């Protein structure tokens, strides 16, 4: 509490180790917000599928999604919007106002060890439409979406948590594929930059 009063902290990210139970989480987020001298962004990684800190915690009886890819397979953005609405509703209930989702990557590299089914599609247009709809669903519940991982993690062969991920695409190639979901008319307010090197661009 003293730290939040003393320093102008702007945001908090809750990881799995911080999440024990529904009542604990709701209380913790409220205490953080109440203690802070500055209104906080309180965020979590809740993509649905493999990355879902709340839904994948057995202490929470929340809807679970197989993956973004499973949702994207329908080709109907309304399915992604419904996913965003569902996730947004329960994040709001537990005191979150920001989600580090949706994943806006285009899953073009079958050897990618970290994105895979976290992406809505291997088709850029489909990924863009789905990510935009999911983001809108989150916003409808007052949750700030964060499209990730700019400039595109889908065509890398490395897990950026353990090594430097590299895309060898040119700026033109990125613009025609990976960047499309980030340039779509999403009304987005936040983008997460990936730990990705682009030697043919920079």
Please describe what each predicted stretch is.
Residues 37-40, 96-97, 141-144, 184-190:
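Short, well-ordered coil/turn segments that N-cap beta-strands
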Residues 1, 5:
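Mature N-terminal segment immediately following signal peptide/propeptide cleavage
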Residues 124-154, 175:
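Loop-centered beta-sheet repeat module
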Residues 6-127, 155-168, 194-202:
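Enzymes and membrane/adaptor proteins characterized by extended Gly/Ser/Thr/Asp/Glu-rich
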Residues 167-175:
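Extracellular glycoside hydrolase catalytic/binding regions
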